[in-house]
Every structure is written in C-alpha cells, then in structure tokens.
Regions:
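A general structural motif
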Residues: 1, 57-59, 100
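Short glycine-rich, Thr/Ser-proximal phosphate-binding strand/loop in the N-terminal lobe
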Residues: 2-43, 76-77
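Short, well-ordered amphipathic alpha-helical segments that serve as non-catalytic structural scaffolds
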Residues: 42-55, 91
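Glycine-rich phosphate-binding loop and adjoining helix at the ATP-binding site
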Residues: 41-42, 61, 71-121
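Short glycine-rich anion-binding loops that position phosphate/pyrophosphate groups of nucleotides
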Residues: 12, 67-70
Length: 121
C-alpha cells in the first residue's frame, strides 16, 4: 500500500483524492469548506478528519495544497487567503498530530505548476 490522501483546500470546496505513488487518482470527491466568518480551524480539521477516517486503512500520508504564503519545509502557514483561520499555524504538524500520519503542505499555485510539469496539462 503506497497510497496517499491529497487535499486541495480552497475557499468554496476542499477537493480530495486517493492517489497512488504514481499520481494515479483512485477516487476523488469534494466537501464544502467551512466559512471563515462562521467557523474556525477546529471545524476545518473536523471536516478533514471525516475524510481521513474514510481512507485511513489505505493511506501512508497526507498532502495538502492551499492558498497563501507557506513554508513547505517546516509546514508553517504565514497567510492562508480565504482560510484565514489557518494563518500563523503549522498546518503540516497539525495534520500529522491530529491524524497520526506524515503530512506535507504546499502553495496551491506551486502544486498546479509541479503537477503540470510532472504529469502534463
């Protein structure tokens, strides 16, 4: 088993996919993103947790793309665009601690460019 749960956290939806190590999508879906005005980071992680539990037995780690100024090496999120409740937090560390899996984050624009470079447009 070398599958990973990949999230693309956006302002309207959190899209996710179960992917293998060759970036083949095995399953995909989306859930609504908790709105900043009404919710906070606990609601955000609760939504992610439901998805993680669905795939827990099939995954080795979590990857997340999201807006904002991020340090992908440390997992720290300086700004987070519409996901303002995540600004100033270490999102990768939080994911790893909450779900007991290795986790990485990267800026969504960089992820799109890397995916296109690797797999094509």
């Amino acid at each position: 088993m070398r599958n990973y749960l990949v999230f693309d956290a956006g302002g309207t939806f959190i899209k996710y996919a179960l992917m293998d190590e060759n970036a083949q999508i095995l399953e995909k879906d989306k859930v609504s993103t908790p709105y900043f005005e009404d919710h906070g980071k606990e609601d955000f992680y609760r939504v992610l947790g439901k998805v993680v539990e669905k795939y827990r037995e099939q995954i080795r780690g979590i990857a997340m793309s999201m807006p904002g100024m991020l340090n992908s090496r440390t997992g720290y999120c300086r700004t987070a665009g519409y996901l303002a409740y995540l600004a100033g937090t270490n999102v990768a560390q939080e994911l790893s601690q909450r779900f007991g899996l290795p986790a990485v984050i990267e800026n969504d624009g960089k992820c799109a460019a890397l995916a296109e470079f690797w797999r094509g447009s």
